[in-house]
């Protein structure tokens, strides 16, 4: 699972979901990618499930890059607890995703295999995403 080794503060405010992504909107490493169409949160478990779905489908060929990292803690109070008495304990680590962000990249496989691997990964994600390929001949 992806979690930070150490953080400056144990608990944070909830991240805002407004606006489009300013960076990370183009494919940087691979030939194919998954791009977020809508915003939301991705937990470390969802990122790992998508990665496993992709790598199992491409078997031993290809390389996968994860372009996001769950660096924000999300807290939750226990069930049947009265309000007050402080903020709840950290329950999940999340990545705040804005529309247009490239989440995963893939290289070293042909396009039909990449499309199917990405489709399987997209089913594990809680937001709308689309398949993108690298522009032009700048390989």
From Swiss-Prot:
Mention one GO biological process in which this protein takes part, according to its record: translation
Q: Which GO terms describe its molecular function?
A: rRNA binding; structural constituent of ribosome; tRNA binding
Basic residues compositional bias: what residue ranges?
1-17
Q: Which keywords are on file for this protein?
A: Ribonucleoprotein, Ribosomal protein, RNA-binding, rRNA-binding, tRNA-binding
- Name the PROSITE patterns for this protein: RIBOSOMAL_L16_1, RIBOSOMAL_L16_2
UniProt xrefs under SUPFAM superfamilies: Ribosomal protein L16p/L10e (SSF54686)
Q: Which HAMAP family match?
A: Ribosomal_uL16
UniProt name for this protein: Large ribosomal subunit protein uL16
> Has UniProt tagged this entry with the keyword GTP-binding?
no
Function of this protein?
Answer: Binds 23S rRNA and is also seen to make contacts with the A and possibly P site tRNAs.
Gene Ontology terms, cellular component aspect? cytosolic large ribosomal subunit
Top-rank taxon: Bacteria
Q: Which family does it belong to?
A: Belongs to the universal ribosomal protein uL16 family.
PANTHER family, per this entry? 50S/60S RIBOSOMAL PROTEIN L16 (PTHR12220), LARGE RIBOSOMAL SUBUNIT PROTEIN UL16M (PTHR12220:SF13)
Subunit structure comment from the entry: Part of the 50S ribosomal subunit.
Gene name per UniProt: rplP
Q: Per the record, which residues fall in region Disordered?
A: 1-24
Q: Which Pfam families match?
A: Ribosomal_L16
Keyword Ribosomal protein appears in the UniProt entry: yes
């Amino acid at each position: 699972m992806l979690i930070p080794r150490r953080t400056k503060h144990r608990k944070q405010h909830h991240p805002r979901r407004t606006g489009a992504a300013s960076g990370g909107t183009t494919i940087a490493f691979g030939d194919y990618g998954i791009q977020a169409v809508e915003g939301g949160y991705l937990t470390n478990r969802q990122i790992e499930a998508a990665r496993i779905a992709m790598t199992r489908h491409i078997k031993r060929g290809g390389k996968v890059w994860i372009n996001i990292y769950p660096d924000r803690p999300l807290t939750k109070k226990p069930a049947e607890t009265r309000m007050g008495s402080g903020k709840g304990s950290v329950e999940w680590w999340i990545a705040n995703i804005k529309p247009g962000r490239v989440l995963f990249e893939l290289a070293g496989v042909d396009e039909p295999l990449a499309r199917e691997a990405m489709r399987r990964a997209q089913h594990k994600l809680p937001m709308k995403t689309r398949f993108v390929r690298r522009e032009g001949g700048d390989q």
